[in-house]
Amino acid sequence: MPKDVTVESFELDHTIVKAPYVRLISEEVGPKGDIITNFDIRLIQPNENSIDTGGLHTIEHLLAKLIRQRIDGLIDCSPFGCRTGFHMIMWGKQDPTEIAKVIKSSLEAIANEITWEDVPGTTIESCGNYKDHSLHSAKEWAKLILEQGISDQAFERHTV
């Protein structure tokens, strides 16, 4: 008999969140005492829009690099299937406000500084879908998201 489980993201009421935001989902302690922190990095308001796959894919590759340049402890930052944001998993306890500042800074770099040569993992050898990238789209989405401001709270706007 399969055990009964609750998947937190399917319990979240997507109609009341106010994107863009960073939301602490959970802090979990492993069997050896290690702590991991799980964040909902929601860039687009759910069920109102979504980022095209080329733009999202390029944002994903850039965040993998840019976040690590700004803060230690990143395990993974992977896009949601709904294409409205990312799950970000980190070692240790992490502050949502600090993470929101890191995301804001990373998006500012994407919008204003990044060139195609800066995008990691865009060759057939380094990416499983290397043809599905769009720096133009990534930049346009980053600008739109930044215009709205990044909040460190999901249910009311508190921009960083």
Swiss-Prot record:
Binding-site list for Fe cation: 57, 61, 127
Cofactor: Fe cation
Cofactor note: Binds 1 Fe cation per subunit.
GO BP term, example: quorum sensing
SUPFAM superfamilies hit by this protein: LuxS/MPP-like metallohydrolase
Keywords of the record: Autoinducer synthesis, Iron, Lyase, Metal-binding, Quorum sensing
HAMAP family: LuxS
Protein family: Belongs to the LuxS family.
Protein name: S-ribosylhomocysteine lyase
Organism: Streptococcus thermophilus (strain ATCC BAA-250 / LMG 18311)
Gene name of this polypeptide: luxS
